[in-house]
Regions:
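Buried hydrophobic packing segments
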Residues: 91, 273-280
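Conserved small/polar residues in nucleotide/adenosyl-binding loops
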Residues: 281-287
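N-terminal hydrophobic/helix-forming segments and targeting peptides
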Residues: 1-247
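Short pre-catalytic strand/loop immediately N-terminal to key active-site residues, enriched for Gly-Thr
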Residues: 238, 242, 258-266
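Active-site-proximal beta-alpha loop/turn segments in soluble metabolic enzymes
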Residues: 166-172, 256-263
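Alpha-helical transmembrane segments that form the membrane-embedded catalytic/substrate-binding core
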Residues: 266-273
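Short acidic/His/Gly/Ser-rich catalytic and metal-binding motifs that mark active-site loops
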Residues: 248-256
Length: 291
């Protein structure tokens, strides 16, 4: 299944984050409030290039700057003064393939490089296991890639892999992601993180968790309660995360219109969130135990 590529703790190629610093194109970020000052300080030739290309101080706007041989050597990109997380996603969407390195035209100590990298990576997410016409190798080759230090990528890789995993699970149809598939996935996650794994089903489920049993007992793929338990430092508090994993809801007597029924695959979103990002927080959160 597609989600297998996210069962890693290291760099996921799908994120578009790389340590390859060859042929780097500078991605120079400028806040819209700084635009007038910056424009007044530009050389005459750059100022003419800016004006002729109608670069405006709107978040998400970009300007490609070539050298004398018309090769792109830098990109000027405008971000907002506040809440600019998704500005980076919009900027990434407009870039051609290549390796980019972020720098601020004016030093900005308050901006988190991690947040910029996360926004960049989320824009590169693609769910395509059922799209036969899409060449995934071409898609990966065509990614605009953000150059970071390996330590910087590793610090956010678990979170991004968890988010991608959650998205894949929610996007997958109910005939693919069934209770047994969720169990298989959780078992692999537990092994990956050296965590305890437990499943309650059949008679044990009926006796101890009758409501879960009642909801899913008529299904061909039987209901179950899945538990992954991470134990870290005993001096830290316990955290328990519970996610509903109804992989398909018929809507009672199937009274929902067809379009609404298509979205019922998302009824297991709670479990997907518990499995995805939450399953990776144990790497960084100061907790004794996460269940």
């Amino acid at each position: 299944m597609e989600y297998e590529q996210n069962l890693i703790l290291d760099i996921n190629p799908q994120t578009g984050l790389t340590t390859n610093s060859k042929n780097v194109i500078k991605l120079r970020l400028l806040r819209n409030s700084q635009f007038a000052k910056w424009l007044s300080e530009c050389s005459e030739s750059l100022k003419n290039w800016i004006i002729s290309n109608n670069l405006e101080p709107k978040p998400g706007s970009i300007l490609r700057v070539p050298d004398k041989d018309m090769r792109i050597i830098e990109v000027i990109a405008i971000i907002g003064n506040e809440n600019n997380f998704w500005d980076i996603s919009r900027i990434n969407k407009q870039l051609s393939s290549g390796n980019y390195q972020i720098e601020f035209i004016y030093n900005d100590k308050n901006e988190s490089k991690n947040n910029l990298a996360i926004a960049w990576a989320l824009e590169n997410y693609l769910f395509s296991p059922f799209n036969a016409g899409l060449n995934k190798s071409e898609k990966k080759a065509g990614l605009s890639k953000l150059v970071l230090k390996r330590s910087e990528i590793k610090s956010i890789a678990p979170l991004l892999n968890g988010i991608f995993l959650t998205r894949d699970l929610i996007n997958s149809p109910a005939n693919i992601v069934k209770p047994s598939i969720l169990e298989e996935l959780c078992k692999k996650l537990a092994k990956l993180h050296n965590a305890k794994f437990k499943v309650i089903k059949d008679n044990n489920l009926e006796i101890n968790f009758p409501l879960i049993h009642t909801v899913g007992r008529a299904a061909e793929d039987k209901p179950r309660l899945i538990e992954i338990s991470y134990i870290k430092n005993k001096s830290f508090p316990n955290i328990t995360v519970i996610g509903k994993g109804v992989t398909f809801d018929s809507g009672g007597l199937d009274l929902k219109p067809p379009k609404a029924m298509e979205l019922m695959k998302k009824d297991m979103g709670g479990a997907a969130i518990a499995i995805g990002p939450v399953s990776y927080t144990h790497l960084t959160l100061p907790t004794k135990r996460i269940v």
